[in-house]
């Protein structure tokens, strides 16, 4: 394999080691680089690149270019992307894009593999009959839930959500026996969310938890719990930002919206189109 030879660097000269290092760092760029461009980028010459390709067992740069890119693409798709530090300071834009795409795909795959479809049916049936849905979340979780709220409103489902945590206890106290209360928290220990759940539990209200922590307060106090298998730290001191958890929560809420919409597809489609028409009409007046 070309990649293996580039990593071992057996019998490489200093110049060849420099070329190998460049290729391993900027492999995706090679697809569109001429031999002259690669020579300039590695401070070598076209003849040096040609000799290097032959040393790798190939008869020229063109063949090397095709085979190397194919191997490099497969090589970079191996392994697990660190959810806390999915890219490094040395990565190219293309490498960052591929790593984030891989992290997102892997996050959704793991989320789907953990779904209990009987549970999802129970939750969706309860949501469909609810007088309203209260969302208890803060920070990133609340940002994800905001889009869910907007989507649900399109077919007439009331979702209460606030970006100010001081209002969460009020939602808990006004919840009825027909209200679905949805708590979203990665750690499952956010103080404002947990305190609201205590009020809900005291009043024997129905609660659904979405969390990454199975033994958390949120998981223990909710009748239904959707767990996400995400190896991402809670503290921003231990990660670049929130990537995997955001993707997992967003995907789950997208599924919830889709399940509810599908329950009465024709009616919901009609309602969303009517709302879109009225909104358009009001803007034109």
For the regions a protein language model found, what residue spans apply to each?
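Short, Lys/Arg-enriched N-terminal segment that forms or immediately precedes the first helix
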Residues: 1-9
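Generic structural signal for well-ordered, non-membrane alpha-helical segments
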Residues: 12, 16, 35, 42, ...
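CheY-like receiver
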Residues: 22, 123-126, 171
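Glycine-rich phosphate-binding loops that contact phosphosugars or nucleotide phosphates
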Residues: 128-247, 251, 255-263
């Amino acid at each position: 394999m070309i990649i293996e030879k580039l990593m071992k660097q057996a019998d490489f000269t200093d110049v060849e080691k420099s070329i190998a290092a460049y290729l391993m760092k900027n492999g995706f760029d090679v697809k569109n680089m001429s031999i002259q461009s690669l020579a300039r980028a590695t401070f070598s010459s076209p003849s040096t690149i040609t000799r290097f390709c032959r040393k790798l067992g190939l008869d020229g740069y063109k063949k090397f270019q095709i085979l190397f890119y194919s191997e490099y693409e497969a090589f970079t798709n191996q392994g697990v992307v660190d959810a806390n530090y999915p890219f490094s300071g040395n990565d190219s834009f293309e490498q960052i894009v591929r790593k984030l795409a891989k992290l997102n795909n892997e996050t959704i795959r793991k989320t789907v593999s953990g779904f209990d479809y009987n549970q999802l049916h129970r939750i969706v049936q309860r949501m469909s009959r609810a007088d309203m849905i209260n969302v208890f979340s803060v920070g990133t979780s609340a940002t994800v839930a905001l889009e869910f709220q907007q989507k649900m409103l399109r077919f007439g489902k009331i979702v209460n959500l606030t970006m100010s945590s001081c209002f969460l206890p009020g939602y808990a106290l006004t919840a009825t026996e027909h209200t679905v209360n949805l708590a979203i928290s990665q750690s499952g220990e956010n103080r404002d969310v947990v305190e609201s759940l205590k009020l809900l539990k005291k009043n024997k209200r129905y609660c659904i938890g979405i969390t990454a922590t199975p033994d958390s307060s949120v998981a223990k106090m909710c009748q239904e719990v959707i767990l996400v298998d995400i190896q991402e730290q809670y503290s921003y001191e231990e990660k670049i930002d929130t990537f995997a958890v955001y993707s997992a929560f967003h995907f789950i809420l997208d599924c919830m919206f889709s399940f509810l919409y599908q329950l009465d597809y024709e009616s919901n489609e009609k309602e969303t189109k009517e709302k879109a028409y009225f909104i358009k009409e009001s803007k034109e007046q």
